[in-house]
Amino acid sequence: MQEGYNVRIYEQAPELGEIGAGIQTSANAVKVLHHLGLADRMAEVSVKPKAFEFRLFDSGEVMHKVPLAEEHEEQHGAPYYHVHRSDIHQILADRVLELDPDAVVLNSTAIGFEEDSDGVTLLLSDGRKIEGDVLIGADGIKSSIRDQIVGVTEPNFTGQVAWRATVPVEKLPKEFMDKIVAIWCGPKKHAVVYYLRSGEVLNFVGCVENSDWQEESWTVKASWEDLKADFEGWNDEIQIIIDNIEKDECYRWALNNRKPVDNWRTDRAVVLGDAAHPTLPYMASGAVMAIEDGAVLMRSLNANDDIAAALEMFQRNRLDRTARIVNGSTELGDLYHLTSKAEFEKGFERRNIAKERNEWLYAYDPMTVELI
């Protein structure tokens, strides 16, 4: 829209509201948000973590560290932020509506599309048909647009589930945790803890190997007692966090992914984000990839008069990078769930996370990278 395109966003929800909790945005995504004029608003609602600290689940010993904060910004040209999902949604929605007050259409569920050489028609569940020049499917892991492009395949259940909850900092001991990302690693599970909303809220995500729970929705509540049992015997810091979570505010969902594919497009339609390359959350790059996708798609459309050529350029420049992140995230799940200190030490020695992330993950700039 900022580039002059006439855009309509069809959203299945009846209203734009809060869902989910924290997301992490590294410099490679934040540069795009800055391009959209959102630097000040992002800084207002976010937290800049000092570092990733990978800790042993019981002793809390730090096994590996990735510096962030000033070092990340100096090296990569933009901050590393933690932000509440609803805050970044609101910031983006406000910017969209500033550009065009009629851009967002609610209560609109996509079920497929039709296309020919003259255009593409989005089909909605209530019978509406929306005509346009190009269709961008950003409708998640169960994307109906993806199904039509790639073929209908079920997402792969990984045998892992994720817990999420938040705790207001006033419920925690004073100076409970520094402003870091603490990743607690242990047998068959791990936990990720960091601050949100200018440090007012602590975000907790716990990933557990559990093949019994296959509910995919992020909004389904589960038993606090089950959460407590999943992390029995873990460090006192984890116990303090769990003990201060509201018992009726525990959410649990199954972690699904798909193997990378080599086509996301037709001549007039394309998918991006989770609709194209859903991933496990272990590289904290799911939202980041979607933001990168948007930037590269915009640049591809600007560079080509022919829509099919633009979509091909977008795909050509995104397939390898997103596949690397998807596969790398799966591998990290194995590393985080080893069973002994000795295994963790060997694992982190083999895989220098700080080095690899700084060399290729964070160094990528979707606004300036050469498109081929």
Language-model segments: residues:
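Conserved N-terminal glycine-rich FAD pyrophosphate-binding loop of Rossmann-like flavoproteins
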Residues: 14-34
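Conserved N-terminal helical subregion
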Residues: 28-168, 211-224, 228-230, 366-372
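Conserved mid-domain beta->alpha element of the FAD-binding
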Residues: 2-14, 136-137, 163, 193, ...
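C-terminal auxiliary extensions adjacent to catalytic cores
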Residues: 351-372
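Active-site substrate-recognition segment that forms the wall
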Residues: 179-214, 220, 224-233, 255
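A short coil-to-beta-strand element that immediately follows conserved catalytic motifs
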Residues: 105-106, 157-159, 176-180, 201, ...
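Acidic/histidine metal-binding catalytic segments
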Residues: 44-47, 103, 233-249, 307-312, ...
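A short, Lys/Arg-enriched amphipathic alpha-helix followed by its capping loop at the start of a domain
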Residues: 1-5, 32-35
